[in-house]
């Protein structure tokens, strides 16, 4: 459960995709685990994730192990986000503000080394450029993230927590590491489609709580 909480925390910063030219639509991501991933763990992890965006709002959704559904809804206008967790029928909503960054994460990102390369490749039909973000965690261990982003969709990851805050444009491929587990998300397709406003509404059957409350409840730290 602690691993699940950590992954959820890391995914919060991926959730806000703000479209200008492409006013609304859906992105489908393929998820691959690193070659050193435990086979049993790998069998329980999701194979894809989805993101919907419309007028400054976004919804990032994936189904975790044991059927747990994790959804993050973000609103650029109010600078807020809410994580919806459905754990086998137990439903919780964890709200936060963009400015409420974890102090340790903020310090690491402020001191991060950002290398914007000239490497490019096409992802889901869009030209993407590679950015390398290197930083040290509280133990002093170095971590490196390769993020491929495009400006063709005029999305913005600025203001988010984590490595995404260092990238211009929309991230269409990125990796996330948590302990021995590495997940790489790559956009398979960007679909231009109408998105219902209900995608960005928190259902009434979710109980609101803080991330600290959730960690205490699940025995996490």
Regions found by a protein language model. Give the residues of each.
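Bacterial Sec-dependent N-terminal signal peptides
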Residues: 1-22
